[in-house]
Amino acid sequence: MLTAVTGINWGDEGKGRVIDLLAEQADVVVRYQGGNNAGHTVVTTQGKFVLNLLPSGILHPGVVCVLGDGMVVDLEHLSREIHEIEKKGIRVTPDHLKLSKRATISMPWHKVQDELEENRLAKTGSAFGSTRRGIAYAYSDKYRKKTLRLGDLFHLKEDSVKARLKTMLVAKNLELAGCYHQEPMSYPALLTWCEEQAELFGPYIADTGEYLEQAVSEGKKVV
């Protein structure tokens, strides 16, 4: 059985609360889009949990949580979020959490761009009010095909992926230098960052479309 929870663009509508209630009876809880700019707070007997990327289903034993194709994932933030809930006794494993190989990676430069642009606008009193987490920049690059997807982390040794990464970095360094007079980012440092994320999150990355198709065919409850 499939259950979809969506809003009508009013902002804080209580979607997370509804999902938390539905998750109690679900087998799989999927977040299909967004990044870590959103958030919801869940209070249980184990404490207070503030979640930005993880669905609240992560707090329910036996529920599989999926971060879907449409998401932009800040892997450093996700690592911290997992660490925080594990400190309160919630164990997170690749059997419990699956990341779509087609989801977009929020790259280090996305937060840098967001911060610099917001600071520039603030000087003229026209700051946008951004969360400074790089979400808009990550989505912009997603649609311009100027970023990596999680599945690319499996192929960092391939020349084609290295070439794409270098091309993206050259363009970003031109933007950062031309618009904000910033020092260029280093390719070796960026590649090392990608390799570290691959080692940490590789076991969690999966073909979630295939997984969900199988879950539905088996009659599982998917929210």
Positions of predicted regions on the chain:
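Non-transmembrane, aqueous-exposed alpha-helical and coiled segments at domain scale
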Residues: 1-223
